[in-house]
UniProtKB/Swiss-Prot annotation:
<feature type="region of interest" description="G5">
    <location>
        <begin position="173"/>
        <end position="175"/>
    </location>
</feature>
<comment type="similarity">
    <text>Belongs to the TRAFAC class translation factor GTPase superfamily. Classic translation factor GTPase family. EF-Tu/EF-1A subfamily.</text>
</comment>
<dbReference type="InterPro" id="IPR027417">
    <property type="entry name" value="P-loop_NTPase"/>
</dbReference>
<dbReference type="InterPro" id="IPR041709">
    <property type="entry name" value="EF-Tu_GTP-bd"/>
</dbReference>
<feature type="region of interest" description="G3">
    <location>
        <begin position="80"/>
        <end position="83"/>
    </location>
</feature>
<dbReference type="GO" id="GO:0005525">
    <property type="term" value="F:GTP binding"/>
</dbReference>
<dbReference type="InterPro" id="IPR050055">
    <property type="entry name" value="EF-Tu_GTPase"/>
</dbReference>
<dbReference type="InterPro" id="IPR000795">
    <property type="entry name" value="T_Tr_GTP-bd_dom"/>
</dbReference>
<dbReference type="GO" id="GO:0003924">
    <property type="term" value="F:GTPase activity"/>
</dbReference>
<feature type="domain" description="tr-type G">
    <location>
        <begin position="6"/>
        <end position="212"/>
    </location>
</feature>
<dbReference type="GO" id="GO:0003746">
    <property type="term" value="F:translation elongation factor activity"/>
</dbReference>
<feature type="region of interest" description="G1">
    <location>
        <begin position="15"/>
        <end position="22"/>
    </location>
</feature>
<feature type="region of interest" description="G4">
    <location>
        <begin position="135"/>
        <end position="138"/>
    </location>
</feature>
<dbReference type="Pfam" id="PF00009">
    <property type="entry name" value="GTP_EFTU"/>
</dbReference>
<dbReference type="InterPro" id="IPR005225">
    <property type="entry name" value="Small_GTP-bd"/>
</dbReference>
<protein>
    <recommendedName>
        <fullName>Putative elongation factor Tu-like protein</fullName>
    </recommendedName>
</protein>
<dbReference type="InterPro" id="IPR031157">
    <property type="entry name" value="G_TR_CS"/>
</dbReference>
Length: 228
């Protein structure tokens, strides 16, 4: 149950297709459910996030998915955005709801076309804060390569108007965090490390005195292979 007394933050995962956004979303809910079970957290499995038949069949996120989790200090509503270029409109819908974004970048690939586009679109829709999760670090043994990927990401963030030199970059593996039985494992600790900068994000000013406004969204699967 959500504790309405806690400050609320809207966050979400953005980035290139197959870099691990949905896996990270599942890992966040799972690790927090283990570490802070008394905070109303519930583990959400990967296939519960990408639950539409076409998403399961193709192994990609098409529509935005929503989960919730909490720390001792804050409540988070999390939007998992699609990374495929064909569903960029759905990504924009999700990003427009965010106070802060978690940019997911694979350590094996570095910045890819949708990495760049998602940073640009996040800036254009008014996402003020970005935290970087460098994923799949378990399969990269070369520290120099990890440093090069981090440098590339920081330069890209700076190019699109974010303070690239100051943004937190957390290196981890969402898959390994999900596989760990103990919530105190090394990869689960990386998930908690990711939460630290999110806990420090300035709380947005909510316009409580203005008329109520909310977004309405849906994805219609009426053509094979195409979402509208």
């Amino acid at each position: 149950m959500v504790d309405g007394r806690k400050p609320h933050i809207n966050v979400g995962t953005i980035g290139h297709v197959d870099h691990g956004k949905t896996t990270l979303t599942a890992a966040l809910t799972t690790v927090l459910a283990k570490r802070l079970s008394g905070e109303g957290n519930k583990s959400v499995k990967y296939d519960e996030i990408d639950k539409a038949p076409e998403e399961k069949a193709r192994g990609i996120t098409i529509s935005t998915a929503h989960v919730e989790y909490e720390t001792e200090n804050r409540h988070y509503a999390h939007v998992d955005c699609p990374g495929h270029a064909d569903y960029i409109k759905n990504m924009i819908t999700g990003a427009a709801q965010m106070d802060a974004a978690i940019l997911v970048v694979s350590a094996t690939d570095g910045a890819m076309p949708q990495t760049r586009e998602h940073i640009l679109l996040a800036k254009q829709v008014g996402v003020k804060d970005i935290v970087v999760w460098m994923n799949k670090c378990d399969v990269v043994d070369d520290e120099e390569m990890l440093s090069l990927v981090e440098m590339e990401i920081r330069e890209l963030l700076t190019k699109y108007g974010y303070p690239g030199d100051d943004i937190d970059v957390v290196k981890g593996s969402a898959v390994k965090a999900l596989e760990e039985e103990s919530a105190d494992g090394v990869w689960s600790e990386k998930i908690m490390e990711l939460m630290n900068p999110l806990e420090k994000i300035d709380l947005p000013i909510r316009e409580k005195d203005n008329p109520f406004v909310r977004s309405i969204e849906d994805v219609m699967f009426n053509t094979p292979g195409e979402a509208q």
